Amino acid sequence: IFSTAFDEKIRKKAREYTFKFGNQLVKEGYRGYFELDFLIDQKDGEIYLGECNPRVTGASSMTNHAAFAHADAPLFLFHLLEFSGIPFDIDVNELNNRWADADNIDSWCQMVIKHTDDNVDIITEAPESGIWHMNKDGSVEYNRFDYHRRAVESEQEAFYLRISNAGDYRYEGADLGILITRGRAMNDKFKLTKRSKQWIDGIKAHYKAKPLPKAQAVEMSDPAFKIL
């Protein structure tokens, strides 16, 4: 999340499409949280609907914890309000306009760290969930426990949510955990920054694993059934 991720024309069109889609969902009887994924043509800036997620998603924490949401209310609170039975009247346009103000958008990034080696082993040690700190040499170390990303005080800190723990299998494509930090993870050419690579390498360095046990041959016995 950062205020200049897309130009105002694209942001305005995405809001309009989302508003129309949401109104149609209401007509269909759907209530509560939903998220839309858009595809953007980089040549002409045209946007297309990618998919609708009628649920909380992996990106929900980014928007629910953003500065604009904290200034009013997390999006998930509106989801709960919808099913609470409590009558409410919200000026949606006023809310959207305030949240669209660049001054109310702070910069955060989220990375899902995966195991990318072509092997399978068993994890014996895994980094704790909580706040991690990056040292001057690019290494990272566990600093303190917290479950809220707002506890991250600078770009030299990150919140890590562990997914793969000791005893789990580690294989190519396995999700190791989710890292959230201030600032940007990629540059304008969609390449990981040096800092992002250091975070990924640093977290991975705290995983230890052992090889899979060798398979043992099972002695075959005579069949215990007959076909007559």
What is the role of each PLM region?
Residues I1-L228:
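ATP-dependent carboxylate activation and anion-phosphoryl transfer catalytic cores
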